[in-house]
From Swiss-Prot:
It is an enzyme of class 2 (transferase). Its main location: cytoplasm. One of its GO terms (cellular component) is cytoplasm. Residues 106-346 form the Radical SAM core domain. Its EC number is 2.1.1.192. PANTHER family: 23S RRNA METHYLTRANSFERASE (PTHR30544), RADICAL SAM CORE DOMAIN-CONTAINING PROTEIN (PTHR30544:SF5). It comes from Chromohalobacter salexigens (strain ATCC BAA-138 / DSM 3043 / CIP 106854 / NCIMB 13768 / 1H11). InterPro entries: Aldolase_TIM (IPR013785), Methyltransferase_A (IPR040072), RlmN_N (IPR048641), RNA_MTrfase_RlmN (IPR027492), rRNA_lsu_MTrfase_RlmN/Cfr (IPR004383), rSAM (IPR007197). This is Dual-specificity RNA methyltransferase RlmN. PROSITE patterns: RADICAL_SAM. One of its GO terms (biological process) is tRNA methylation. Keywords: 4Fe-4S, Cytoplasm, Disulfide bond, Iron, Iron-sulfur, Metal-binding, Methyltransferase, rRNA processing, S-adenosyl-L-methionine, Transferase, tRNA processing.
Length: 375
């Protein structure tokens, strides 16, 4: 047998229930084996077929020959003073991504911020990840692997009363809807009772506005939706979020209305609005935002800008952030200020740069500009 004829083992970590059932049927096994193995992987954190004691020895041996459970490798783990935890993970081809676990409510709520791509192609002007350029999409195994790593770090069996990860937000590195074919299977695993058993309200996808894929998502899953808006007029949003030149605000919000109409329960849209000093933090910006959302059931998350080298932007003062929030309250809107978490370990929103091995021209120019300024 030559190396060319060796069949790679199937990584079971990223398989949905349907895919896992098909895999076992292809081996001549019953479909129920899929649920057994999924529970070992996602409930028990098991990566060793020999430990799966409710499978026959013959099946375990066969699985060792034909399959594997391969998650990302932890390169770095850090814990912030506020309890936020960040992992730098090595995925296939030696690329690095980051995932962040944010505790709240006395530790009862743990929200995992998950990456969908190595780097990001959107180049939003206020986001440090975008300045690193784009390398590739993550596979479904690499996406769900972030949940697997975070859950395993607690070393406890997972069930409905003991979930190390209670919420997932697809708000890490990358634009999830530009990696649709891998993000959707990963989210299905988050929702599956044989996976992580999260409710649709506890899984949130954040998008900058890839409208065709947003319409497609509404036909497949009705997870919670967040939109990275950051401006209430096209002129400013074109500057902050270049994708707006392709799908403008009106087109995006119409897609959001269609999405909410497909949800099987009453759901609100989350609007993400990064506050940047003297750019979008004045009273007329708040009034413009309120008018824009007048007929859309929504809540607003205000995110004070997190500075990074050569961004050209500044963080507004705390007083200005509070004023902006009050203006929205006075206009009848629920507006929450997202507390900066994990900034002492570069885990705060917008700081997910990581040690991404990216060779794009934009990344090279960014590095060169830093070096020139340092000279």
């Amino acid at each position: 047998m030559t190396l060319d004829t060796v069949t790679p083992r199937t990584n079971l970590l990223g398989l949905t229930r349907e895919e896992m059932e098909s895999f076992f049927v292809s081996l001549g096994e019953k479909k129920f084996r899929a649920a057994q193995v999924m529970k070992w992987i996602h409930h028990e954190g098991c990566a060793d077929f020999a430990s799966m004691t409710n499978l026959s020895k013959a099946l375990r041996t066969r699985l060792e020959e034909l399959a594997e459970i391969r998650g990302p490798r932890v390169v770095y783990e850090g814990t912030s003073q506020d309890g936020t935890r960040k992992w730098v993970l090595e995925v296939e081809d030696g690329s690095y991504v980051e995932t962040v676990l944010i505790p709240a409510e006395g530790g009862k709520r743990r929200t995992l911020c998950v990456s969908s791509q190595v780097g990001c192609s959107l180049d939003c002007s206020f986001c440090s990840t975008g300045k690193q350029g784009f390398q590739r999409n993550l596979t479904s195994a690499e996406i769900i692997g972030q949940v697997w790593v975070a859950s395993n770090s607690f070393g406890a069996r997972r069930d409905t009363t003991n979930r190390p990860v209670t919420n997932v937000v697809m708000m890490g590195m990358g634009e999830p809807l530009l990696n649709y074919d891998n993000v959707v299977p990963a989210m299905k695993l988050m929702l599956d009772d044989n996976g992580y058993g999260l409710s649709k309200r506890r899984v949130t996808l954040s998008t900058s506005g890839v409208v065709p894929k947003l319409d497609q998502l509404g036909d497949e899953l009705d997870v919670s939706l967040a939109v990275s808006l950051h401006a209430a007029n096209d002129e400013l949003r074109n500057e902050l979020v270049p994708l707006n030149r392709k799908y403008n605000i009106a087109t995006l919000l119409d897609a959001c209305r269609r999405y909410l109409a497909k949800c099987d329960d009453t759901r609100m849209l989350t609007i993400e609005y990064t506050l940047i000093k003297d750019v979008n933090d004045q009273q007329h910006h708040a009034e413009e935002l309120a008018a824009l959302l007048a007929d859309l059931p929504s809540k607003i998350n205000l995110i004070p800008f997190n500075p990074f080298p050569h961004s050209g932007y500044e963080k507004p003062s705390r007083n200005q952030v509070m004023r902006f929030q009050q203006w929205l309250y006075d206009l009848g809107y629920t507006a929450l200020v997202r507390t900066t978490r994990g900034d002492d370990i570069d885990a705060a929103c917008g700081q997910l740069v990581g040690r991404v091995k990216d060779r794009t021209k934009r990344h090279e120019r960014y590095i060169q500009s830093i070096q020139l300024d340092a000279d």
